[in-house]
């Protein structure tokens, strides 16, 4: 089924069935005649994968494996308690948001929403008529996903196109940000609803990670939209430069290290 334009990346077992007995996580050692498995398959386009491999090789490195971002982020941020639950993980990046549902620590659903933090920045730049770099600075320093979190007395000084100075009230900045963040959360929910069923029935908790999760109030906005417990996920169990590495923005990178470490060494 993955001939042509698609290449299989992951075949992740969810549960096994032995002679009709369901809900088996590990059938090794069991006696039976018929073994069935429910598998979550993840594929990607051969063209983008070829470009990725070429970029790694041109950097003088050897590519051992490819891991989807949603799986890597889950390996980094989910707690032992969450690995026993059904959790919706949203990795809000710059250009996209990776959506994943983990059941009992296993990836049961994955999708990509083609929106991320850069789209929020673009909205700010367009509506305030400021350069993209200035919009990113303002978003990171003063942005909030909910207007009620912004200081109503705070007026921000912004550098407009052509070098002119402008002003914007902090709550107005949040009102620019909120619609796009709502859209990202809505599309993520839609992908789960259409595949697994109603989110509030299927999921126990929501974990936000990625650079977009650093936007103040994103967890509160998600709690309002989903009606579920929400937390911001940081990489677990890291040491060394923890003030740098233990950030939602580095969840996928930490997860990739763990994914690579879990793979058998090649002879």
PLM features: residue spans?
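A conserved active-site cap/scaffold subdomain adjacent to cofactor or substrate pockets
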Residues: 114-135
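Feature representing long, continuous alpha-helical segments
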Residues: 122, 171, 175, 179-186, ...
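A short acidic Gly-Thr/Ser loop motif
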Residues: 89-96, 102-105, 114-118, 209-213
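Residue-level signature of catalytic and energy-coupling elements of molecular machines
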Residues: 56, 91, 124, 188, ...
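Nucleotide/phosphate-binding catalytic cleft detector across ATP-hydrolyzing
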Residues: 1-89, 107-108, 128-177, 195-198, ...
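Acidic-glycine-rich active-site phosphate/pyrophosphate-binding loop
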Residues: 92-100, 223-235
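Phosphate/pyrophosphate-binding loops at sites that engage ATP/ADP/AMP, CoA/4′-phosphopantetheine
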Residues: 185, 189-204
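Glycine-rich phosphate-binding loops at beta-strand->alpha-helix junctions
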Residues: 44, 143-146, 200-225
């Amino acid at each position: 089924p993955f001939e042509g334009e698609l290449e299989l990346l992951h075949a992740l077992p969810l549960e096994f069935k032995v002679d009709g007995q369901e809900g088996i996580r590990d059938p090794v050692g069991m006696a039976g005649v018929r073994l069935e498995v429910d598998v979550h398959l993840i594929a990607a386009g051969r063209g983008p994968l070829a470009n990725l491999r070429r970029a790694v090789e041109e950097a003088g490195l050897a590519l051992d494996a490819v891991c989807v971002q949603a799986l890597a982020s889950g390996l980094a941020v989910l707690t032992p308690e969450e690995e026993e639950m059904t959790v919706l993980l949203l990795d809000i990046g710059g250009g996209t948001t990776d959506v994943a549902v983990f059941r009992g620590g296993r990836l049961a659903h994955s999708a990509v929403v083609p929106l991320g933090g850069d789209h929020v920045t673009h909205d700010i730049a367009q509506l305030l008529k400021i350069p993209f770099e200035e919009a990113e600075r303002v978003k990171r320093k003063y942005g909030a996903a909910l207007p009620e979190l912004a200081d109503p007395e705070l007026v921000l000084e912004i550098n407009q196109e052509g070098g002119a100075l402008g002003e914007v009230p902090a709550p107005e900045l949040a009102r620019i940000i909120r619609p796009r963040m709502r859209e990202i959360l809505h599309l993520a929910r839609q992908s789960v609803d259409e595949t697994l069923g109603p989110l509030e029935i299927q999921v126990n908790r929501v974990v936000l990670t990625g650079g977009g999760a650093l936007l103040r109030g994103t967890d509160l906005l998600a709690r309002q939209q989903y009606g579920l417990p929400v937390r911001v996920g940081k990489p677990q169990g890291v040491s060394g430069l923890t003030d740098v590495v233990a950030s939602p923005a580095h969840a996928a990178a930490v997860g990739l290290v763990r994914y690579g470490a879990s793979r058998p060494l090649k002879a």
